[in-house]
Amino acid sequence: MSANKVLKLIKDKEIEYVDLRFTDPRGKLQHLTMDVTVVDEGMLNEGVFFDGSSIAGWKAINESDMILKPDTARMFMDPFTSHNTVVLFCDILDAVKKSPYERDPRGVAKKAEEYLKLSLIHI
């Protein structure tokens, strides 16, 4: 789904919050909830900076800038919140290189899936 379609859904469904979710190296689901007023096309396409040193096993404080990059194809309305909230799963990017962070479990899974597709191993 494109960023424009996500923004249209946010408007049409009167969404109040956007919950950006990702998994830490230990497999625990983490999230960052944002008021919908700060969500725009740039944020959906480029991501949001966050402090990676707050996640165990990721970055030291002096190199902690990371990016949560929403995957607009992985979105759903959270049925358990009292306010209209949309959830977007995110990839983690290195803020300096703008490339996938090598310790992001989601990124590791994507690399493994790609490797399996290119190898003789078929699942």
Residue ranges and their predicted role:
Residues 1-121:
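ATP/Mg2+-dependent ligation/transfer catalytic cores
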